[in-house]
C-alpha cells in the first residue's frame, strides 16, 4: 500500500508552475490483457478519495463510449455511489441502460465524434477534482490512445512476472505516438525488487 500512497503524492498531488494540480484526469492501461488495470484503478481511486477528501470519479472507458448523452454536460448525473462518500463511479451497466433509453446518433457517439469526446472530458473535469479512467489494454483496444490528447496523462500498469520489457517500452511508444503524456509505470502484484528503469519514470 505504501507504493500507491507514494504514487498519489508524486502523481496526483504534483503542482505545476501555475500552482494548479498537473494530473487531475488520468487514464490507466496496460500492454496486454490480465495486467490488473481495474484492480489498480479501484485501489488508487479509493486511496485518493480517502487521503485527499476530494471528489473522485472512477470510470471505465467503455462506459464513456456507451453513454451516448444528448448533452455531455450531464455526464455526472449517471454516477453511482461507492463505499467511500467522496468516491463515485460510472459503470458499463449504467451506461448501457442510458443507451437503451436515449438511443445512439453520430452527434453523441464517443468513437466517431471528437467534439463529443472533448465535451465529455470537460464535463468530468468540471464536476470532479480527480478522474481515473480504466482503459482496456493497448493490445485489444484503442481506448487509451483515443483519450491520449484529452487527459492529463496515461499510466501503464505492469504485472510483476508477466509483462516483458519490450512490451512495456512498446506501450510507452504507442502513447507518445498518439501525442499523449506518458506518466510512468505502475507495478501490480509486486513480488520482487522493482527494476530501476521502472522507478525512473515514476
Residues covered by each model-derived region:
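Hydrophobic positions on the alpha1 helix immediately C-terminal to the Walker A/P-loop
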Residues: 40
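P-loop/Walker-type NTP enzyme "switch/lid" segment
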Residues: 1-2, 13, 18-25, 29-35, ...
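Conserved catalytic-core segment of NTP-binding enzymes
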Residues: 112-202
Amino acid at each position: 500500500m505504501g507504493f500507491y500512497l507514494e504514487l498519489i503524492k508524486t502523481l496526483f498531488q504534483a503542482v505545476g508552475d501555475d500552482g494548479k494540480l498537473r494530473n487531475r484526469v488520468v487514464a490507466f492501461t496496460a500492454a496486454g490483457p490480465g495486467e490488473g488495470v481495474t484492480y489498480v484503478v479501484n485501489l488508487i481511486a479509493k486511496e485518493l478519495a480517502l487521503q485527499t477528501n476530494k471528489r473522485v470519479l472512477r470510470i471505465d472507458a467503455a462506459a464513456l463510449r456507451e453513454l451516448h448523452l444528448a448533452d455531455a454536460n450531464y455526464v455526472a448525473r449517471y454516477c453511482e455511489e461507492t463505499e467511500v462518500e467522496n468516491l463515485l463511479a460510472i459503470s458499463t451497466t449504467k451506461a448501457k441502460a442510458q443507451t437503451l433509453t436515449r438511443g445512439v446518433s453520430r452527434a453523441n457517439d464517443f468513437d466517431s465524434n471528437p467534439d463529443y469526446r472533448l465535451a465529455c472530458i470537460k464535463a468530468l473535469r468540471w464536476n470532479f477534482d480527480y478522474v481515473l479512467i480504466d482503459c482496456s489494454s493497448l493490445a485489444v483496444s484503442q481506448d487509451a490512445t483515443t483519450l491520449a490528447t484529452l487527459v492529463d496523462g496515461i499510466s501503464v500498469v505492469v504485472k510483476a512476472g508477466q509483462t516483458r520489457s519490450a512490451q512495456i517500452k512498446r506501450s510507452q511508444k504507442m502513447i507518445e505516438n498518439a501525442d499523449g503524456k506518458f506518466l510512468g509505470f505502475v507495478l501490480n502484484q509486486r513480488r520482487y525488487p522493482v527494476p530501476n528503469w521502472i522507478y525512473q519514470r515514476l
